[in-house]
Amino acid sequence: MPPKSTEPDYRPSYLAAAITSLVVFSIYLATLAPSTAMWDTSEYISAAYVLGIPHPPGNPFFVLLGRFFAILPLGALSVAVKINILAALTSAVAAGMWFLITERILVNWLPERWQRITGAALAALIGATEFTVWNQSVVNEKVYTVSLMGLAIISWLTVRWSDDPDGPKADRLLVMIAYLLGLGYANHMMGFLAGPAVVVAVAVRRPQTFLRWKLIVISVGALLLGMSPFLTQPIRAAHFPAINEGEPTTWNAFLYNFNRGQYGKPALLDRQAPYFDGQLGMFWMYFRWQWLRDVKVQYPAIQSILAMVYMLLGLMGGYVHWKRDRKSFWYFGTFMLTLTFVLIYYLNFKYGHSQCTAMGNPPDVNCEVRDRDYFFIVAFSAWGVWSALGLVYIWEGVASLFGS
């Protein structure tokens, strides 16, 4: 049944969302990388092509999906370009999901359908054209746009569930969400980032769900089924593909790969850089990049102004979201908190590479070997939803001043 709203005949504008996704996809295709690129790009393109195992944990869902794109009969396109198209397509689908979520939020305060579609299109286009999102969407540097798509789909399904948690489709939606969480984990650990927000949404909207053991068992089963691509790793490893990192042909080797044992991550309380000056400072640096980034020429003053405007728009949008649609805010607000402050704390990065460069590369400071803005691709993309809500709120205020 359609979610309850102030507009009884509300229907998600799937056609408008699809058109928006197509526009975003066209932008990415027009700027698509013609081949491979730096860092992990070649490793992952090659691993997908040979059904191999890239560095732990091996990202088996991406490998399977990438292999599918690698063998598509797309004329004379190289394997690299085909897999770059995968990045563009998955990111464009994510933009469509942000469109649907934004439109749903706006149902509670914009009476006209065209107004909601305009606001939703703004959210999708803003999120899709940020530096990190665009950069990852035109060359398959790794697995992050697949994670972005998965988390955006989970977000849309959770918003739909929150509208009618007692409806006939509610349990099926939760099982599907659990499956997608598991499948997302088989792509990258990032796929679990929606989990805490889903739990909060269920706890607020229908807490008795946690007492329904049959649904919980089925959901856990769906979660494990989603993670089943990991079972392909020992099979492929036994065939010794050209890329076979960790060679997980035994149970111990498989667990070592699955648990990312080679990285030796320090305890969370053992901070590799100060949380505020170092790690939050690194996030703010990456946030500043989103609307003005040039690898040759930097404009720190203009960057900071644009970033502050974008930050304030998002905070305004988040506040309006809380005031006007609590049902979806419980999920989306927790999701944004997880993608930012919680994720920054959990990742526990050293000083960012560009931070160290700006500090003159002091020998006594531990620095990351590269900039890792891609870990926050979902946060930057989803922030487009709140920034669009902020723009709509300003638009509404200006319109009221002129009596329209």
Where are these regions (language model features)?
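Transmembrane-helix motifs of polytopic, lipid-linked glycan transferases
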Residues: 85-110, 153-157, 312-316, 385-388
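Membrane-interface transmembrane helices that cradle and orient dolichyl/undecaprenyl
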Residues: 110-114, 137, 146, 154-174, ...
